[in-house]
Every structure is written in structure tokens, then in C-alpha cells.
Design a protein with these regions (language model features):
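Acidic, Mg2+-coordinating active-site segments of isoprenoid diphosphate-utilizing enzymes
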Residues: 44-57, 97-106, 131
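Acidic/His-rich, divalent-metal-binding segments that scaffold phosphate/diphosphate chemistry
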Residues: 1-70, 77-81
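Conserved beta-strand-loop-short alpha-helix elements that form
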Residues: 121-135
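Histidine/acidic-rich helix-loop-helix segments that form or flank divalent-metal centers
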Residues: 14-40, 80-125, 140-143, 151-187
Length: 187
């Protein structure tokens, strides 16, 4: 997804990672790829503290277990707070469960709309949503979906739940859809 954004809509990344222009974004693709790769490794680090809940695959979660899951973004930032070089991932960790408009999701007190890395948070969030929704192994909260079903849900929520420009990019790029379908369903 990031590769397609960099090629087709680099203006969506202006402001992210300190880039102040499209030219700066285009001159530093590796900076974006490296940041997203590290973010993908770290964004759910708070789940390490609740592995016993995450691994409940045979039943629905209790309200207490759900509450602990909702706390994992903040728990993740606490894990990294003593490592100054990791602070750049803070917004990614906190924002990956917030809706695009910031009105839904958790943690409630994190304002993803104010983050300069908002678009990167959204790319990570959509990627995480796709991974979770298409996972057919070990889902305790629903049936796995295919990519087309996910894209339909994204389309219904564009502008509020999901970034309109990003979803329209997904909708309009058949090659990206094919690649994501393969990665999520066969790869």
C-alpha cells in the first residue's frame, strides 16, 4: 500500500516523518519503508503483556479481557518509553485502533488527527485490519473475510472510519487489489 501511495499519491505523505513537500517525500522512499517496517514490528508490542488473552481461540472474550485488549496501545508505549530512539513510533502504536476521523476506537485520549504521521498510522491500521479480517486461523471473534469483502467495508466507511483518499486509491488500482488478494488469501 505504501509503495502505491508513494508512486500515485505522494502528496498524502507530506507532513509525515518531517517531510514538508512532495519533493522531500519522493527523495526519501527508503525512510518511509524503513519506518513502516519498524512500525509493523512494534505497533502491537503492548499485546505481549496480554498474550494469554490474545491466544483465547476457542471462545468469545469476556468484557474484562476486552478491556485489557483496549489497553494494549498504551501498554506498548510504556514498553518503549525508556528507549529514546523508539519514541518516533509512539503515534503508530497509539493510533492503530483509531478511526480516520478520530471519533471511534481506542485509546480515547489519543488524537490521531493531530499526528503529523496520521497517514502512516492509517496505512498501518488498514494493513492491520486486512490481516485480522482475512485471518482464517485462530479467529475467536468472527469468520474470515476475503479481500473484496474488506474493500467493500472500507468503501462504506471512507471519510469517517477510513481515509477517503487511501480507500479510493485501493478501489482504483486493480494491480494493488490483485497483489493484496494474493498476499491475504493465497500468499
Amino acid at each position: 500500500i505504501l509503495d502505491t501511495v508513494l508512486i500515485k499519491k505522494p502528496e498524502l505523505l507530506v507532513g509525515a516523518l518531517g517531510c514538508t513537500s512532495v519533493m522531500e517525500v519522493l527523495e526519501q522512499p527508503e525512510k518511509f519503508f524503513n519506518f513502516m517496517e519498524e512500525s509493523a514490528k512494534l505497533f502491537d508490542i503492548g499485546k505481549l503483556q496480554i498474550a494469554e488473552i490474545i491466544n483465547k481461540q476457542s471462545r468469545r472474550l469476556t468484557s474484562r479481557e476486552k478491556k485489557r485488549i483496549y489497553e494494549h496501545p498504551k501498554a506498548g508505549t510504556k514498553v518503549l518509553e525508556k528507549i529514546p530512539s523508539m519514541q518516533k513510533y509512539r503515534d503508530m502504536i497509539l493510533g492503530h485502533h483509531k478511526s480516520w476521523d478520530g471519533k471511534m476506537g481506542y485509546p480515547k485520549d489519543f488524537d490521531n488527527c493531530a499526528s503529523p504521521d496520521r497517514m502512516l498510522i492509517e496505512i498501518l491500521r488498514i494493513s492491520d485490519c486486512l490481516d485480522a479480517a482475512t485471518d482464517f486461523i485462530g479467529r475467536s471473534y468472527g469468520t474470515a473475510k476475503n479481500f473484496a469483502q474488506c474493500l467493500e467495508e472500507f468503501s462504506l466507511g471512507k471519510g469517517t472510519l477510513y481515509c477517503q483518499e487511501l480507500i479510493e486509491l485501493l478501489e482504483g488500482d486493480a494491480a494493488l487489489q490483485d497483489e493484496l488478494t494474493y498476499l491475504l488469501e493465497a500468499g
